[in-house]
Design a protein with these regions (language model features):
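Long lumenal/extracellular ectodomains of secretory and single-pass membrane proteins
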Residues: 1-140, 150-184
Length: 184
């Protein structure tokens, strides 16, 4: 098995198998093939070559929400690589669509009133109020807010929406778990 060639859904679903651990994070097998697969998976995750482009962001957000307090750094590395792949895919698609719209606008006379908005000129607001936790949607809200923040050309910050709103600054180079912990 080549972890870099797996579909994003498969590598997320079977991440523990790929890393040769059981559900309690103990070594699953001492078989040399299982150990070699875990080493290939770790190398692929370290190189950010694990596919995540087609992931369901809600599923990924809920896994990140469960793992961010976990000490399994290898699993976090794999999930972070998948997040990076998903983010890169979103950014690329958004850039391509914006360029297409700008080209179309230019071909149609470049009327300033109809100029497409820059999708990167945004500030995220993340709802972290109690109702989000109660509705079990806080993890997806946080993940999507982080994605918008990382895409933004305005700055590396977002505003929390809660009883005590705050401005949170992120380092976009940090892994998703470090950024996630700033919100939770």
């Amino acid at each position: 098995i080549n972890p870099s060639k797996m579909t994003s859904g498969s590598s997320l679903k079977y991440r523990k198998y790929l890393m040769n651990v059981d559900f309690d994070d103990y070594i699953r097998s001492h078989n040399p093939d299982a150990i070699a697969l875990a080493e290939r998976t770790l190398k692929a995750a370290t190189n950010n070559s694990i596919n995540g482009a087609g992931l369901d962001s809600v599923k990924l957000a809920n896994i990140i929400g469960k793992l961010y307090m976990n000490n399994n750094e290898t699993e976090k590395l794999l999930v972070n690589a998948q997040f990076n792949s998903l983010f890169d895919s979103i950014k690329k698609n958004l850039q391509e669509e914006h360029e297409r719209l700008i080209d179309e606008w230019a071909k149609n006379g470049s009327n300033p009133k109809n100029k497409p908005l820059d999708p990167f000129n945004v500030i995220a607001t993340i709802d972290v109020s109690g109702s989000m936790s109660g509705a079990n949607v806080i993890n997806p809200a946080v993940l999507l807010g982080i994605i918008v923040t990382k895409l933004s050309t305005v700055g590396n910050f977002f505003i929390t929406f809660s009883e005590n709103p705050t401005i949170v600054t992120i380092n976009p180079e940090d892994n998703i778990f470090d950024i996630f912990s700033l919100v939770m």
